[in-house]
Amino acid sequence: MEYNPAAIEAKWQEAWNNAAVFESDVDQSKPKFYCLEMFPYPSGKMHMGHVRNYSIGDSMARFRRLAGFNVLYPMGYDSFGMPAENAAKKIGGHPHDVTWSNIESIRGDLKRMGFSYDWRRELATSDATYYKWNQWIFLKFYEMGLVERRTAPVNWCEPCGTVLANEQVKNNRCWRCAEEVRQKDMAQWFLKMTTYADELLDALDDIEFPENVKAMQRNWIGRSHGVDIDFPIVGSEDVIRAFTTRPDTIFGVTFVTLAPEHPLCESLVSGTEYEASYRELADECARMSEFDRINMLRDKKGVFLGRYATNPLTGEEVPIYAGNFVVASYGTGAVMAVPGHDQRDFDFAKKYEIPIRQVLSEDEGKEPKVTGRAFEGLGWMVNSGRENFDGLYGDDAKQAVIQALEQEGKGKGTVQYRLKDWLLSRQRFWGTPIPFIHCDDCGVVPVPAEDLPVELPLDVVFTEGQSGNPLASHSGFVNTICPLCGIEAKRETDTMDTFYDSSWYFLRFTDAMNSEAPFDKINADYWMDGGVDLYIGGIEHAVMHLLYARFFTKALRDAGLNEVSEPFSRLVCQGMVNAPTPYCASCNVELHVDLKDTPCPTCGDALTFRSAKMSKSLGNTVSPELMIEKFGADTVRLFILFGANPEAGMDWSDSAIESNYRQMRAIHTALVQGIENDSASGLMDDWLLARSRKAHRDWNSQMSNIGLRDGVMISHFEMVSDWQWAQRRGGVSHEAAQAYLRMWIPMLYPATPHIAEEMWETLGESTMLANTVINMESTPNENDTIILAQEEYLRRVIDRARGVRELAQRHTDGNLSSVIIQTAQVWKDELANKAIQMHQESFDFKQGGNKFLQTQPYFRDEETKGEVMQFWKMVVVGQKKRRGRIYTWGEQENNLIQSGFDEVAFLTANAGFMSEALEIGTVEVYRAGDGEDVAGKARSSLPLEPGIAWR
């Protein structure tokens, strides 16, 4: 029977589809398991990154079904976004057509891989049946006070013609087109995420996310406990309110810095000699994102605004500056500058020759050290100039200052957040229309729920070089009637950020066919109880998507739509799939694979290769479709899952996938052998079945903890090796073979389901594995440990004999014809047994070991005393950097020694097999002292470590 993956895979994919085996509904009698991967943007063909992500998810979904779980495993498409719009411009088409063509392509790829999705629940965010509920939820949030339209400085990308959220600006450049981003004031729609800032932060302690993801979210939310302090402007009624987390440094303030966009700046410099310099700075800051101004600035610039502010606790007048490192959206947009205790302020003060004053000391009772840098740690207050402050430290110092400010009405303790409200609106076509209408009489009016969805028009023309939002000029879309007063009005032409679409899709999947509501509460609460049980996706979504999804879940809970507080119970961030690409070390740049045989086009140096993430831009991609055609989907899945643990990066290798294909053929051969086995008896029955029970327990443990690589190692490599070993050792009976296969084939199913189904059917099973529940509790038989330990002992002896032969052959002119094995003397076995028992009883060998040894009869024999002491040391202490054997022997070894295992009898019984395995004529076995001490091996023989010599 030949292994024919194409035929097998087509057969079972059709069978699964016809039987609708992966469709799932609420079933309170079963434990549920909701498995979900971050759904793809349908750019066309599936790539290896997709294959890895979905192979992980599919394996876990199939594993949980085998274990009796009611599994929800859906698929959809994150199908709104600029790429489809840009593609439509290139071909003069419509984003809708581009998107649906791509969806059909990737759907075919997914089905060819055999992924076990409930296809009834398939959704696309660009389908009006989905984005209708985007709009409905938006109106619900509006009713809850979570939606706000206001003018605000925004990140504007000119080439894309749209606003970007802070999270979408990378190094002051658009995450999509990489062009420079500018700050611009516009009327925009916001979701008030800050309402949930505390809950979003505090709940991180209770969810199973990778620690680096939690750290990124904590940093992004950025809760700061501090105080707002009022600095009156000299000669004016205006006051600068500055937020600080270090009120203990207030006596060191030597200047105040405003964000260039702070509204007070204009009034302070207008018509003065400082206006031109200020406007130059403000224009420069407008070309930078807030993120870069906070985190990436190297050159801190400022402009004196010609005015002074008064320190509320000292009365000192300090100059007011505008600085590029202060942003309006954090705190109050104003900073009290303390150069003695903040390095950023220190650098600024040095540059502009502003006084530096130290008011904290590292050492109690001493003056501050002069180090040429700011001391930013906590310290003892000094030089305050006021009573009751000097000598205070840390939190006591902070609280004393806050109390003084509040008592004098000059400040108030408060909490600030780095997290900002979600700027949602985009000036693009291919997104969810924001369901509002602009009426001259009524203002901004929500679209009535019964009029949803507000649909995107299909008659928009897209052309190369087109800019702006086509909705704004589409009269059929824009012109409408006000639902309140009935006069002519205009629709909102902004669309929603596409991250909105993916912020609740996991809830829609729980009830995807519902046309009356976004989802039914009963369905959502069942499938989302505790959150999505396993969510798989890239680390790049740690802040944006994952944070938005957490916000949505909490807001929808408060809207009464569900009882869930967190969307995801466990998050796995899968590693990248990498492949070799040309690399120039001098330029530190990766180049397209077409340049592999050329010098670097920039510097002319010879190129080397290094591993890089597969990407179209580098040309180092591998087509899953071609690999499936050549090797089959099961082989591709095996390569992906065995290549690395889910969280680790992995390298593509042609030789590795070819090796995995050979392994699949070896598995097929072994399975066929087992099915066709009709032997009445077998020497290895007990061992093979004991081994299968042990392997099944280990496999279940690994798979349950998403240890897919180690799980696949057991199911696809060790189980084959065990079968082959059993055949070499004397074979197994038909009954044992059948039992082994019924244990083994389901273990193959999660990773390589097609071959597993085929062999399960060939075995005579009438129920598909897709509909089968197996017992995951594989209880060992009483003698399993001893049986396995004996066989492992035999393997070790053979391996050691091979190693000794290599050494012996170097010192022998002729051919080696026999191997002599001397097992340990009886007294060594007895003493080892006692040492194991004492260790299990927590005996203190350091205190009482020698005293015990002196009571033993072997110790009192002068001829053996020295050898006994040496052996005892090896067993309980160790030597030559090796720990004592009682610390290195495992459960199997301990059980074997304590069982009274007769090494001589066992090895003698298996001498024939050893002779065959070692390709040697004679194998002699005896206990040390009962025969010739060949090569002096008797003294070095230990329990389970016989002395071995060749001659």
Feature-to-residue mapping (PLM):
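Alpha-helical recognition segments enriched in aromatics with Gly/Pro capping
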Residues: 307-330, 478-648
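Amphipathic alpha-helical
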Residues: 8, 13, 193-223, 259-303, ...
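Non-catalytic terminal extensions that flank enzyme cores
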Residues: 1-48, 188, 200-201, 211-224, ...
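Acidic, turn-prone loop/beta-hairpin segments
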Residues: 78, 436-440, 447, 453-454, ...
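C-terminal low-complexity, glycine/proline- and small-hydrophobic-enriched intrinsically disordered tails
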Residues: 658, 767-951
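N-terminal catalytic cores of NTP/NDP-binding nucleotidyl/phosphoryl-transfer enzymes
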Residues: 25-93, 122-137, 244-245, 312-348, ...
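Catalytic alpha/beta core of large soluble enzyme barrels
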Residues: 57, 70, 262-363, 368-369, ...
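Residue patterns forming the tRNA-binding/recognition surfaces of aminoacyl-tRNA synthetases
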Residues: 2, 11, 15-19, 90-248, ...
